[in-house]
């Protein structure tokens, strides 16, 4: 008979938390390093949201509850909608102004 491997035997909660903190740090680093380009900022924010989702799923598996996994799916859905709306706004702004630099967008203030 085939034995189904339980991944919790090999990968502990600490591994998931380390992975999550690394992904969050990469997203934070990208957020601070690429302040001029809005698309890079959106990608960095998505990385940070992914790190939060890894935490939710890891704790959900560790505590043997489904609520964290369900909440993670809801967060991913909302984040996808947020990104789609943000990119649509950026596309319209680029068609009108010809640039998507942060400095040009900050000039829109009244």
Swiss-Prot record:
GO cellular component, one term: NADH dehydrogenase complex
Organism: Rickettsia typhi (strain ATCC VR-144 / Wilmington)
Alphabetical keyword list: Cell inner membrane, Cell membrane, Membrane, NAD, Quinone, Translocase, Transmembrane, Transmembrane helix, Transport
Transmembrane segments: 13-33, 41-61, 73-93
Function: NDH-1 shuttles electrons from NADH, via FMN and iron-sulfur (Fe-S) centers, to quinones in the respiratory chain. The immediate electron acceptor for the enzyme in this species is believed to be ubiquinone. Couples the redox reaction to proton translocation (for every two electrons transferred, four hydrogen ions are translocated across the cytoplasmic membrane), and thus conserves the redox energy in a proton gradient.
The keyword NADP belongs to this UniProt entry's keyword annotation: no
Subunit structure: NDH-1 is composed of 14 different subunits. Subunits NuoA, H, J, K, L, M, N constitute the membrane sector of the complex.
Coarse class of the protein's main subcellular location: membrane
Listed EC numbers: 7.1.1.-
Localisation per UniProt entry: Cell inner membrane
GO molecular function, one term: NADH:ubiquinone reductase (non-electrogenic) activity
Any GO BP annotation: ATP synthesis coupled electron transport
Listed name of the protein: NADH-quinone oxidoreductase subunit K
